[in-house]
């Protein structure tokens, strides 16, 4: 069964959503992060909560550590955190604070030797966030181009004990227009590492279609704030 991971994105300790990762598209969510934690925690079908420090992702260092540490105390659900994680000490600090999994993006993509070291040090607890426009990978809060192809890059990661690869189609993110099913399905076939889909998810039908592609988990952003998404789920 595909896992459901509702998302909380933070700017200045406020729960927000962006469209296509553009910081000038910031939209404050109706629920605070604390309220979202409580809301998501009531559902047995929620396997973990996905938290991102958006300013950390852009500024290249974690900005919301203390606030995220306070959120950790509000739920027994697993929590994964990403955004600005660039060092082993940051990862260890998050784990010491009770965070279950850490997400690395830019650092892991630009330094695969470091990524391998972290994954072997914390097997199954490190997730790599791979964000792309089409097949072109972006880094540093989605603001910097790379010359890396999504599939070529992911294929070289097969021997690394990552918890999974979080794939975000930037063009879909925040739009609730549906995930990029085609590229997501191709990515699942290109790697033995579990693939987590993020970006554009609207409703349970999208989840069911992702499940049919053997996607391991789905990260739900804006849709998770709508009661209609959770109808019939426990």
UniProtKB/Swiss-Prot annotation:
SUPFAM superfamilies: Ribulose-phoshate binding barrel. Keywords: Amino-acid biosynthesis, Cytoplasm, Histidine biosynthesis, Isomerase. GO terms for cellular component: cytoplasm. The keyword Transmembrane helix does not apply. It catalyses: 1-(5-phospho-beta-D-ribosyl)-5-[(5-phospho-beta-D-ribosylamino)methylideneamino]imidazole-4-carboxamide = 5-[(5-phospho-1-deoxy-D-ribulos-1-ylimino)methylamino]-1-(5-phospho-beta-D-ribosyl)imidazole-4-carboxamide. InterPro entries: Aldolase_TIM, His_biosynth, HisA_bact_arch, Isoase_HisA-like, Isoase_HisA-like_bact, RibuloseP-bd_barrel. One of its GO terms (molecular function) is 1-(5-phosphoribosyl)-5-[(5-phosphoribosylamino)methylideneamino]imidazole-4-carboxamide isomerase activity. The gene is hisA. Belongs to the HisA/HisF family. It is an enzyme of class 5 (isomerase). It comes from Staphylococcus aureus (strain JH9). GO terms for biological process: L-histidine biosynthetic process; L-tryptophan biosynthetic process. The keyword Cytoplasm applies. The active site is at residues 9, 131. Its EC number is 5.3.1.16. It is found in: Cytoplasm. Gene3D superfamilies: Aldolase class I. This is 1-(5-phosphoribosyl)-5-[(5-phosphoribosylamino)methylideneamino] imidazole-4-carboxamide isomerase. Pathway: Amino-acid biosynthesis; L-histidine biosynthesis; L-histidine from 5-phospho-alpha-D-ribose 1-diphosphate: step 4/9.
